């Protein structure tokens, strides 16, 4: 059996027909799951009992298991979920003034080995299925239902590299963006990549309205090679060519994410080099205070404001990202790594 959560509506229609159901059943199922938050075939009362029983022969509809749930002083909520095969993943709910944003995970572990990230301490075991990505949003919506709220924004920035799980990530986007699904607008969805150049170009050619964020963290190959091994395969020059290709095809603005690390990438000279690198692009810089992971040996920069001011003086659009859940291990991979004894508690 396969999970009902893994099907975009058009695929579910085809699969239902192949099993002898009527095509329109797909819209009924989508309405029950994604609009009414019902996760049991038995409760889908406008579907015949015969069809409900038959659906259970072909599809599973079980939720994820919550292993740990932590709430921060700033109302951020971090979930550690257990998958059917026992592996664990993280999801973070970040309440905002404009709605509820959720950071989802796309892989069990990560092979990108960025030196500042807790996710890389646990190597990639496998990709998440589309269903397992969708279920993260489902579980957060279930949590929010107690206060009559819903998820309004998605950032695909959790554990793993989304473009290393390209097809399942894009199917996930299809489902949550569907007018009969979670109805989350494409411009309320952001996918972050560490720089898989061929996939950035492939994503550009889809001409979707989904936002693209680039985990840059350094303006040159010397520093980026030190922080992000992926740069040795796709150096800054090739990455920026892919970004320009994306902007040209989509006319969409790109976000450059930049974690500031003490005495590594936070000097005035580095800020000036960053400004030169992205000047003239339809883009802005998201400066991120570092959530320290002791095992990685890096420290949070003490020069965040000076770096920000330098970029502003250079007429570069930039913001300093608000911190979420600093007191509850809300940085990517921290909670799972602590739960599995990889980093200190």
Curated annotation (Swiss-Prot):
Catalytic center residues: 90 (proton acceptor), 332 (s-methylcysteine intermediate)
Record Pfam families: Radical_SAM (PF04055), RlmN_N (PF21016)
Domain Radical SAM core: 96-327
EC class of the enzyme, as a word: transferase
Residues annotated as binding S-adenosyl-L-methionine: 160-161, 192, 215-217, 291
Entry EC no(s): 2.1.1.192
Keywords: 4Fe-4S, Cytoplasm, Disulfide bond, Iron, Iron-sulfur, Metal-binding, Methyltransferase, rRNA processing, S-adenosyl-L-methionine, Transferase, tRNA processing
Cofactor: how bound: Binds 1 [4Fe-4S] cluster. The cluster is coordinated with 3 cysteines and an exchangeable S-adenosyl-L-methionine.
GO cellular component: cytoplasm
Known catalytic reactions: adenosine(2503) in 23S rRNA + 2 reduced [2Fe-2S]-[ferredoxin] + 2 S-adenosyl-L-methionine = 2-methyladenosine(2503) in 23S rRNA + 5'-deoxyadenosine + L-methionine + 2 oxidized [2Fe-2S]-[ferredoxin] + S-adenosyl-L-homocysteine; adenosine(37) in tRNA + 2 reduced [2Fe-2S]-[ferredoxin] + 2 S-adenosyl-L-methionine = 2-methyladenosine(37) in tRNA + 5'-deoxyadenosine + L-methionine + 2 oxidized [2Fe-2S]-[ferredoxin] + S-adenosyl-L-homocysteine
Name of the protein: Probable dual-specificity RNA methyltransferase RlmN
């Amino acid at each position: 059996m396969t999970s009902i959560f893994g099907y975009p509506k058009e695929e579910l229609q085809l699969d239902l027909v192949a099993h002898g159901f009527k095509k329109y059943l797909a819209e009924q199922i989508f309405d029950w799951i994604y609009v009414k938050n019902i996760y049991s075939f038995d409760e889908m009362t406008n579907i015949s009992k015969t069809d409900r029983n038959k659906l259970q022969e072909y599809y599973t509809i079980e939720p994820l298991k919550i292993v740990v749930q932590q709430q921060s002083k700033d109302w951020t909520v971090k979930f550690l979920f257990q998958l059917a095969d026992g592996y664990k993943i993280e999801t973070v709910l970040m309440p905002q003034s404009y709605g509820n944003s959720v950071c989802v995970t796309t892989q069990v572990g990560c092979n990108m080995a960025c030196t500042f990230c807790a996710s890389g301490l646990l190597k990639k075991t496998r990709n998440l299925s589309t269903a397992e990505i969708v279920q993260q949003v489902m579980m957060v919506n279930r949590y929010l239902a107690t206060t009559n709220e819903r998820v309004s924004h998605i950032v695909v920035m959790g554990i793993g590299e989304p473009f290393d799980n390209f097809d399942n990530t894009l199917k996930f986007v299809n489902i949550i963006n569907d007018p009969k699904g979670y109805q989350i607008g494409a411009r309320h969805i952001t996918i972050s990549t560490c720089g898989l150049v061929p996939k950035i170009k492939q994503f550009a050619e889809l001409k979707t309205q989904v936002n693209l964020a680039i985990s840059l963290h350094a303006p040159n190959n010397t520093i980026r090679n030190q922080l992000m091994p992926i740069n040795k395969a796709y150096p800054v020059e090739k990455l920026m060519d892919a970004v320009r290709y994306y902007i040209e095809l989509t006319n969409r603005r790109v976000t450059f994410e930049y974690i500031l690390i003490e005495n590594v990438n936070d000097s005035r000279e580095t800020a000036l080099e960053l400004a030169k690198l992205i000047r003239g692009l339809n883009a802005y810089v998201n400066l991120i205070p570092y959530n320290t992971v002791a095992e990685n040996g890096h420290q949070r920069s003490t020069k965040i404001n000076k770096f920000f001011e330098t970029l502003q003086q250079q007429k570069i659009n930039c913001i300093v990202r608000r911190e979420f859940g600093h007191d509850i291990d809300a940085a990517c991979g921290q909670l799972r790594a602590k739960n599995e004894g990889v980093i200190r508690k």
